[in-house]
Amino acid sequence: MENQKDVEAEPEITPEMIQSTFKALEAEGLIRYMKGGAYLPTEKGWKLLREVVSGREKIIGYGHEKIIAKDENCFEITKNKKPRGEDSVIAVRADKGCKDLNERFKAAAKTANRMFITIEAGDVTENITAYGSPALRLTDANEIVVRKSDFIDGKTVAILADKSANEFSKEMKKALKNPKTEVKITLEIK
């Protein structure tokens, strides 16, 4: 029987560890994201590691004077006319919830590939990188949430994001507090 001191415990793997590992691989040239997928270098050139299924979705929402955008874990877009006390809301009166997203985009989001998110409010832009997941449900009719963690529920559209509502610029937060501001959110997997 093996001595228990010789057995290594499995490390607890966090979403941050996975994200930093892939960033390190990319920085070292050990993985490359190109048209069609993620590639690894081999003796004969680049080999496809994972095919990227592309998809794109645009969502339109609006600012609101009660938007505070202070959540440290996520940001949320809602069809509601005003935030209901959530500090994650960045846009209200959205034209779509997760359930309304087009089928091509939903299929692409479920491949665990990188998602590029652009939020435009007036002349201010925020860019976020996150990931899809085969576990995404995309069933909520009212909300869309992008999370820094790997938690998934019916309103989650992306996980392991590099930015939460709290990390948006002061200029963006100011623009989001104006009810006249049209907020354009683009979700793209390419």
State what each model feature region is.
Residues 12-27:
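Short amphipathic alpha-helical interaction segments
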Residues 1-10:
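Short acidic, hydrophobic short linear motifs in intrinsically disordered regions
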Residues 84, 125-173:
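Short, solvent-exposed interaction modules
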Residues 26-36:
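A short, conserved structural fragment
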Residues 58, 82-133:
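Acidic (E/D-rich), amphipathic helical modules within compact regulatory domains
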Residues 36-53:
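Short, cationic-aromatic polyanion-contact patches
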Residues 51-86, 92-93:
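N-terminal targeting and processing segments
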